[in-house]
Amino acid sequence: MKKIVFLSLSPETWDGLETLWDNATADPENEVTVIPIPTYKRNSDDSLSDAHYTLSGYPDNVPITDVNAYSLKANHPDIIYTQNVQDTSNPGFCVHPAFHTDALKACTDQLVYVPYMCTEEISLDNKPYLDSIKMLFICPALLSNVDRIIVQSNNLKELYLYYLAGGDPGLIKHWSGKISCDDYPRNEILKKYDRLTVYRPDEWDTLLCPDSDGHRKVVLLCTSVMGILTNEHHVINKLRELFEDFMNNTDDHVLIWRPYPAIKEAIKNLRPGLVDDYDNLISFYLDNHVGILDELPSPTSAIIISDEYIGDECGVMELYKATGKPVSRLDYGV
């Protein structure tokens, strides 16, 4: 009997583990446990917010175990999957110390890191640039405690190898066997479902399944935190213009707009002058029934249902590229 534990940061990041869980539970010889773990926001004075912890919001077919009901030390699982390795190195976020990688490493034979965030494909030719962003990918805990890493693409695998091994043939051989990209869950889940089987709220069907024959083109529009912080009112103006265009083309197109969930909090803290305009934009979209406002925890449904992507360069765009469907970056005219 092999014991396998999945440590989930939240229901919103479960799609970053789901297909690995599917594979593990398919073997009756495996004892599989899913444990949501407490997370905290780190304030500017280095104090921590109250813990964020929930057992709800996960798929109905996934049994959830309370963090206090399972001892990693006593059970010593064969494999632990974690979505976080920045034990103390993230200035804005952390997990409970019991789930830092050094503690996890002492409780398992194999600690596997599955990064949730997707990043744009990065050219490996610009070494100074690669060195300048190294801290976004590599931290001491990763080097010391992680046995295996699952990344989104071969490009990211090569990036990790550059950071971890440099040009050392021995280290390249050592790390190559520890980094995989053909089983990255956020890519694999896009193959697991199709338009008919992927979850979507009932209210989406009003627009997605009209009382007419023929398929209307479904366009996914994503707005990122960085996009709005960088381009500010240009984003508001461009989106308003785009919404008006879609209002005039509802017979042929359906728009799914997915603003990144943290946008409101980000502009409140960093661009307070945009808050009212952003709220008005949301109201305009909803009041005029422009399209679907995607507030689901994961972008998986919108990616699978839609025919085309337009919007910001972000993790959703990178996932969309893996589908082979058309992708366009939205130009804010700045």
Where are these regions (language model features)?
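Nucleotide-activated donor-dependent transferases that construct or modify glycoconjugates
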Residues: M1-P11, L220-S224
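Active-site and donor-binding regions of nucleotide-sugar-utilizing enzymes
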Residues: V5-I189
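Conserved catalytic-core segment of nucleotide-activated headgroup transferases in glycan assembly
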Residues: G16-L20, Y184-D279
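A generic structural motif
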Residues: D27-T33, T250-L255, G291
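Short, surface-exposed amphipathic charged segments that create phosphate/polyanion-binding patches used
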Residues: S49, P77-N84, E188, K192-W204, ...
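Short glycine-rich, flexible loops that bind phosphorylated cofactors or substrates
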Residues: T88-N90, E158, G227-L229, M317-E318
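Nucleotide-activated donor-binding/catalytic signature segment of Leloir-type glycosyltransferases, i.e.
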Residues: R271-E295
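A donor-sugar binding/catalytic signature common to diverse glycosyltransferases
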Residues: D294-V334
